[in-house]
Amino acid sequence: MQRVERAVRIVAVQAALLTTALHLLWAVPRLSPSMLTESVADSRPFLFVPAAVLLIAVAVAVFRGYRYRRLSTLGGGTLAALLVGYPLYHGESAADALASEPLALAAVVVEAVGIVAFAGLYYFHHPDRLGLAAGTNKNADND
C-alpha cells in the first residue's frame, strides 16, 4: 500500500510541476508592464502565474510527505480549474484551439493525469488509513 501511495505521490508532484512549467512557458512571454496600465484583451497570463506559484507550493508540500486531504484537494482543484477554464475561455472553438496549440494539448493531458493522481492521494490520506486517528483516543493511553 505504501508503494502505491508513493507512486501516486510522485505522479501528482510531477503533474503539478509540469503543469506549472507549461503554463509559465505560455504566460511569461505575454506579460509586459504595459498590460498593467492599458486595457487587457487576455487576462490569462495574470491568472496563470499565481496558479503556477500555488501548484509549486502544493508540489513541495506533497513531496515533503505532508499527508493532508486539504492539500490533495487544493492541488486537484487547482488543476481542475485550469482544465475546465480552457473550454470555458475558448467556447465552441475549444477543440480547434486545442488541436492548433501543442502546448495546450500537453497541458490538458497533464492536468487530467494530475487530477486523477490528487484524487488518489485524497483517498490514501484518510486519517484512519494511516493510523493517525488512533492517537486521538485518550483512553487507549490509560490502559
Language-model-derived ranges and their functions:
Residues 1-143:
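Membrane-interface extramembranous regions
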